[in-house]
Amino acid sequence: MEAWQIFRSLNEVQRRTFLACFLGWTLDALDFFLLTFVVKEVAAEFSVSIVKVVFAITLTLMMRPLGALIFGMLGDRFGRRIPLMVDIIFFSLMEFLTAFSPNYTVFLIFRALYGIGMGGEWGLGASLAMESMPAKARGLASGVLQQGYSFGFLLAAVVYWVVFPHFGWRALFIVGALPALLVIYIRAHVPESPVWERQRASAKEASLGMGRMIRENWRLLIYAVLLMTAFNYMSHGTQDLYPTFLQKQRGLSVNQTAPIAIIYNLGAICGGTILGFYSQRWGRRRTIIIAAVLGILLIPVWIFSPALPLLIAGGFFMQFMVQGAWGVVPVHLNELSPPAWRGTFPGVVYQMGNFLSANAAMLQAKLAEHFVRPNGEPNYALTMACVTLAVFVGLIVLAAIGREQRGIEF
């Protein structure tokens, strides 16, 4: 009821702005996940190994920090709105061009360039959304905004199901260019960030002095990157190898695994929205800690349950907690950010954390081969449980020693 009252209290401009930012992140995630569904087909088309196509996904992730830096600095210099529009057009164009790649090398170049665009969208969208919301609505808005990533995955699954069987993998990337149409909506209905407008003079001056920002805020930068590294290890560590665990260790088929993935993604959406909302009452750090503690308690059900229904329930509630903590991230990083660098700071630390955790799945796979089961097969359950426990503990410590700036005036 209170969440509905908060939504009702938003004016038309605030609702339109938030919708644009949410759709931007959702459609960005859609474009990213489309490739994950057709790795085998792309490899066959270009006569390369699956490993090489997976490298294209990794390269996209590696380029995201560069995109966050470039478009974040543009956002601090010229406002959030126009750089966001340019970014959406850029990553949509790279997605479209991917469909016409004549060979693997060109395909790799387009995916790297797409990674720059993907990295730029989150920081600009999050800062525009948070700066356009009243303080009391930030927690709920943060939780819903972050779940655009999960919505993007579900949307990618639907597009794959509808388009791929009839038109092949290249058509997926043509459909993936449709986010460019969002620019028309932003151009017509979304104003510039009111916070950036008020701070326009100081923001322009500050955006020219990135070195000064680093010198004055280096402790905060290091802390935020460590925090986001823990966050990204938490999400990658509980998601990336979970389908492999279900198939290789629990003996489930692909057709059985897919519905389970949808169920725990629904848990992620619910968790991010609900805990994002309650962070407005409990505080950002306390909400993160609560989610991490409950996540630790869920590990046995999530990974060791002998019965499949319990395992599915464990997956749902584990992602409820993981993405519940993530639901706090957009608002927490924006509240911690130096005001003049709010276009740059959240996106860069988010993407740097993502970059530093890019080896999470590989690390778990290697450890699983070391901690084998009695039959000699990799022990994914034990490995994922240990890594997840360690990451949750690290996240609790980092959240506990950090600053709380809930409701700070922008």
Locate predicted features.
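Cytoplasmic helix-loop-helix junction between adjacent transmembrane helices
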Residues: F110-Q147
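Extracytoplasmic gate region of multi-pass secondary transporters
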Residues: L35-T36, W218-I269, S357-A361
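Cytosolic juxtamembrane N-terminal segment immediately preceding the first transmembrane helix
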Residues: M1-L30
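Cytoplasmic membrane-interface "Motif A"-like loop-to-helix N-cap segments
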Residues: R77-D87, R281-A292
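Conserved MFS/SLC helix-loop-helix module at the cytosolic interface between two early adjacent transmembrane helices
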Residues: L66-P102
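Helix-breaking motifs and short loop linkers at transmembrane-helix boundaries and internal kinks
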Residues: S47, G79, F100-V106, P134, ...
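Helix-loop-helix hairpin linking two adjacent transmembrane segments in secondary transporters
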Residues: L145-A188
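C-terminal transmembrane helical hairpin of 12-TM major facilitator-type secondary transporters
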Residues: S279, R285-V329
